[in-house]
Amino acid sequence: MKKRNVIRNAAVLMTTLVFVLTFITQPMFAHGATSQVITKIYTTNKVVALTFDDGSDGTNIPAILKILSDYNVKATFFLTGKAVSHHPAKIKSIIAAGHAIGNHSYSHPYFTKISTTQMKSELSKTEALVKNLTGKTTKPFFRPPYGAYNTLVLQTVGSVGYTKTIKWNIDTIDWDGRSAYRIYTKVLNNIVPGSIVLMHTGAGAKYTTAALPTIIKGLKAKGYRFVTIPTLLGINPTQITYVVKAGDTLYAIAQRYGVTVQQIATINHITNVNLIYVGQVLIIPR
């Protein structure tokens, strides 16, 4: 009997130890830090966001900026750290032209294949380079390289301030050198209100600059208005943010800032005003 008790106690101890070790070796995240994945917004307003991923060469940036300026269109550029290091003057010109920016990692790895430490390093290196060069932040917008993400990626990037993971609902696949006509038809045939369009700035996307004017004219003819990602999401970079604490309610937060519950709910895409959570980052409208 005594021997059985010893064996049983040893088994319980081992099970407990395994559980504890498993728990403490898992990455820890603030509750509610998970990044929100956005492929488009749901609206009846004819708005569209043109986005450009900038790899290490940025060959077409000057031509893209010229076209956007000619048609008075603002876009969003997702920057890699290598791009910032490789062509800083072009990055400055993006900011000077009034376009929005986001973080596209430093070296463009699959985030689903690297460690959480590496993910954070990829983001922080790019953020530091962009801030030092332009004084602007890439937060809270992250575009995952190759569009690849999983729960761990979303938890990790969210925990360091990238609360919006921006994907797309229209991929032009311009990087493979396809014709301007194919790029144009991909956009015009799939456009819906609230769309996010993916294009690239690199040399591989050699017909993007030829397609861009026709895309802009075609969408304008359909009644579309061009906006940046911050505008599409109702986020102004100068707006105040508030981190939800234990005991908070949307009503109390709204009273504190002199706005309505509905205003906070709308700008943060909250469908149930009773469901907010500790650690949630809320944008406060002005």
Place the predicted regions along the sequence by residue.
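Primarily a LysM-type cell-wall glycan-binding module
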Residues: 236-258, 262, 280, 286
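His/Asp/Glu-enriched short active-site or ligand-binding loop at hydrolase and phosphoryl-transfer sites
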Residues: 148, 153-190, 224-235
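Active-site beta->alpha N-cap acidic-glycine motif
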Residues: 33-113, 118, 125, 129, ...
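C-terminal domain-boundary segment and adjacent tail
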Residues: 35-44, 71, 85-86, 206-238
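Structural recognition of the beta-strand scaffold that forms the well-ordered cores
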Residues: 48-51, 75-79, 100-105, 140-144, ...
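Sec-dependent N-terminal signal peptides of Gram-positive bacterial secreted proteins and lipoproteins
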Residues: 1-30
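Soluble non-cytosolic domains of exported or imported proteins
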Residues: 55-59, 78, 85, 113-120, ...
